[in-house]
Amino acid sequence: MLRQTLTQASRMRPCISVVGFRGFHASSPCEATLKEIEQRLKSIKNIEKITKTIKTVAQTKLTRAQRAMEASNKYYRVSDEVFKEAGTKAPEEGKTLMVACSSDKGLCGGIHSSISRLIRRELHDPKTFENTSLCILGEKVRTQLLRFCPESFYLTFAHIGGASPSFEEALQISSNILEHAKDYDRIVLVYNKFASAVSFETVMKNLYTTKAINESPNLSAYEVSDEVHQPLMEFAFANAIFSAMAEAHCSEMSSRRNAMENASKSAGDMINKFSIQYNRQRQASITNELIDIVTGANSLA
């Protein structure tokens, strides 16, 4: 297994875990003291602050990611139109290299598991499993698939997803992939396509190879010399990787914002429940103390 790591490192975001409270049940108020409930409330409020902050950051990044995605898609559509007009057909059979586009970041719902599920579904067929190798962009999908098909791994890339992807980053990735993909008949790209602010679609896209470009029936209309075919394919491949990374990054930011919004709402609901329980417990404690005082005063009278 060959592991390729990009030199462009991303800023790492702290990981947050919501830990359950052992020995405490909200349905049994008598089991918890006022101090315990107060500690739980404080912890949940801190988590709520963190989730709201992550949501705000994700919302800001989503706006920038959408602009970057729209720009990359316009550029890719113009590039892809050339091959469509030339009648280029991407290969659909043969030894396959499947490129999964994800990232190293979590706290974004099912954005990574959806890619893993699609790949597992494709590799469920024994013939496909035998003829397919994996190239993974990002640690999340790599970790998920490592338990399922470690023998299928061929290339992995880390430090993906820190900021909006650049064409330079996509070019580094595509160059490394093409350098080690000479023995493959087809290359398939798996990524999350941005649909709206609340949804995404996991898709597979067949990419053009040098052989497919050489066999294009109408390519001669562009008067392209044969020695340009290979650089043209490399540019088209880098363009496709860049567009997919921009789509995946935008989908990730949207999913993270939605996940943190749901987490903030859940934290708010828990705060309300524990606040009610705290007030009831405190009221019961005060009532019991008043009863003890009145009872003691009556016994002395």
UniProtKB/Swiss-Prot annotation:
Q: Which domain of life is it from?
A: Eukaryota
Membrane topology reported for the UniProt record: Peripheral membrane protein
* InterPro entries reported in the protein's UniProt record: ATP_synth_F1_ATPase_gsu, ATP_synth_F1_gsu, ATP_synth_F1_gsu_CS
Location(s), subcellular? Mitochondrion; Mitochondrion inner membrane
Pfam families referenced in this protein's UniProt entry, alphabetically: ATP-synt (PF00231)
Keyword Zinc annotated: no
Is Coiled coil one of the keywords?
Answer: no
Q: Supply one GO CC term from the record.
A: mitochondrion
The residue range of the signal peptide is none
Query: What are the protein's UniProt keywords?
Result: ATP synthesis, CF(1), Hydrogen ion transport, Ion transport, Membrane, Mitochondrion, Mitochondrion inner membrane, Transit peptide, Transport
Q: Which GO terms describe its biological process?
A: proton motive force-driven ATP synthesis; proton motive force-driven mitochondrial ATP synthesis
> Which GO molecular function terms does the record list?
proton-transporting ATP synthase activity, rotational mechanism
- Where is this protein primarily located? mitochondrion
What does this gene product do? Mitochondrial membrane ATP synthase (F(1)F(0) ATP synthase or Complex V) produces ATP from ADP in the presence of a proton gradient across the membrane which is generated by electron transport complexes of the respiratory chain. F-type ATPases consist of two structural domains, F(1) - containing the extramembraneous catalytic core, and F(0) - containing the membrane proton channel, linked together by a central stalk and a peripheral stalk. During catalysis, ATP synthesis in the catalytic domain of F(1) is coupled via a rotary mechanism of the central stalk subunits to proton translocation.
Q: Give the record's family classification.
A: Belongs to the ATPase gamma chain family.
How does this chain assemble? F-type ATPases have 2 components, CF(1) - the catalytic core - and CF(0) - the membrane proton channel. CF(1) has five subunits: alpha(3), beta(3), gamma(1), delta(1), epsilon(1). CF(0) has three main subunits: a, b and c.
Write down what this protein is called: ATP synthase subunit gamma, mitochondrial
Q: Taxonomic classification, please?
A: Eukaryota, Fungi, Dikarya, Ascomycota, Taphrinomycotina
The protein's gene is named: atp3
